[in-house]
Amino acid sequence: VQNPDEYIRYHARKVAEILFYSAKDTMNDVQKVHYTLKDYDGVSAKSGNPANTSIVYSTQHIEKSANESLYKLDFETRGVLFHELVHAYQFEPKGIGSYSTNKTFWACIEGLADAVRAQAGYFDMSTRKPGGNWMDGYRTTGFFIQWLTTKDPDAIRKFHETVRDLDEWSFDKAMKRMFGDDASIEGLWNEYQAFLSK
């Protein structure tokens, strides 16, 4: 990456464009992003608060991607950056505990980050397979949330709004807020599974 500051700013703008309608929306005030490469067994992690976010990216993961191809390295690095930057900008669900104490909270946070990555085009969509549960987090949840854009192009933004607005967040309450009182997480998940099985 020849200009790391511009590279991160570009991806941060793209994340904001997917999560929000406009710059006038209520959003976390991300001031600084510290991006560090570190030799460890893992992929990447975000820490800190929105104003002062730190992202660590594994040089072991970089090497693994580079050994496949330069295309894979670029594709994976951008995808990981999209995911981690979402964590800086995204709201956290209210009334259900925390990331480390509640699986619904965790599935929402990690699922939304991977939904934005998928929407940005940095997942191989052919890897989507039937099965799992909306509570599985990461790709399983993320692909589902991204699939909701086939029902409403603004589904990711609306999902994110439910995280901000609902006093006691749940996937079912989010689906009802987004698609009406007759919608349910189970019904939409089953529809998504049928889509994947075609």
Give short role names for the model-derived ranges.
Residues 11, 100-142:
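Post-HExxH zinc-binding segment in Zn-dependent metallohydrolases
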Residues 61-81, 96-105:
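Short pre-active-site segment immediately N-terminal to the catalytic Zn-binding motif
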